C-alpha cells in the first residue's frame, strides 16, 4: 500500500514537472556556488570557477597554519609590503585589482585583524593600516574586550540581562586560541547556497505531499476508501509513511548531490577551521567548525522541512483539500517578515520554524533564552523542540484522518 501511495504522488504531471524544476534549480545553485569563488591573476583579471578556486587555494596555502602572534605579524609585514608596491588608489579600478591580487591569499586573516581592532558594531576596511606588529598579537584578547565594552554600553541595557551578558562573555572566552587557518572556500560557498536549496526542497515537497490525504475526496472515492476493511487504519498509515518517505528521500538526495558537486569541485579542505576565522562569523558565540556548521545547517534544514510538511499534511487531512495545505510552508517563511516589527514577538520569532532553514545566517545573531535559570541560544532549543513536535504530529495526523466522517 505504501508503494501504491508513492506511485500516486508521482503519477501526477505537476509532480513530475516540479521535480524537473527542482533538479534545474539544483544545477543553477551548484553553478552559482562553484562560480562564487573569485581569483585575480597578476594582470588584475578576475576568474571564477574550478580553476580559479584551485589557484586561490594555492595562494592561501602559504598562510596555512596556526594564527599565533608570529603569523599575524607576518601578515602585517606582507600587507605593508603590498601597500608600498601596489597602493590603493581612489577611483583606479585596475590598480586596486592588482592590490587585491596580492592580498587575496591572506584576505580572510586581514579581515580578522580589521574586525578585531574595530568597535564591536563597526567595521573599518583600512583598520589594519594602523595596527602595529606588537598590537596585532592581542587580536583574540581584543575580540573579548570589544564584546565586553559593547555589553557595558547603554545600547545593550534593554537587550540583555546580566546572566545573558555573562553567558556571551563566557562563550567568547571558551573559544580556543590561537585559531588554525587553511582554505575553507568550498565549505563557505556550499553554506552560502545551502539555505536556497533547503527552501526549494521544502516548497516543492509541499506540493507533492499536500495531495496525499485529499486525493480520495477530489476523486470522489472517499466513501469507498473509508468503507474498505483496511482503509481507515492501514490505508491512513500507508499515506502517512509514504509522505515521510517522499520528503526524506527527496531532501537527502538533493542535499547529497549538492554537497558532492560543490565540495567535489571546490575542495573538502578547511572543514576543521573554526567559523570565527574570517569575516562572516567572527562575532558568533557558537564555537564550531565549518564542517560542523554545514552539518548543522542541513540537519536543521531537514528538521524544519519535515515539521512544516507534517503540519501541511495535518491541514490537508483535516480540510480534505490540498489548496490550503500548500500555503502552510509559504506562510511559515513569509509570516516572520510581517511580524518582525512587533518587538514583543521577538522571542517567539527567534525560534520560529523558518529559523531552522537559515541556520548559517542566524548563527551570528545573539538570540538568547533562559530555561530553568540556564541561558541557551536559540539553535539548541529548536533542535530539541521541533523533532519532538514532528513526532507528536504523526499520531495527530493519523487520528485526524482515521476518524474522518463520510457525509
Go through the PLM ranges and name each one.
Residues 31-32, 319-352:
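Transmembrane helix segments
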Residues 209-224, 228, 232:
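Transmembrane helix boundary and interhelical loop/hinge segments in multi-pass membrane proteins
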Residues 1-16, 22:
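Aromatic- and glycine-rich beta-strand/loop motifs that create alpha-glucan
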Residues 11, 15-18, 304-312, 367-407:
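Alpha-helical transmembrane segments of multi-pass membrane transporters/translocases
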Residues 24-81, 136-216, 237-318, 338, ...:
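Secretory targeting signals
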Residues 347-368:
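Short hydrophobic, aromatic-rich alpha-helical segments embedded in or entering the lipid bilayer
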Residues 14, 231-232, 321-326:
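Membrane-helix interface segments
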Residues 22-26, 242-243, 330-334, 390:
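Residue-level recognition of pore/gate-forming positions within transmembrane alpha-helices
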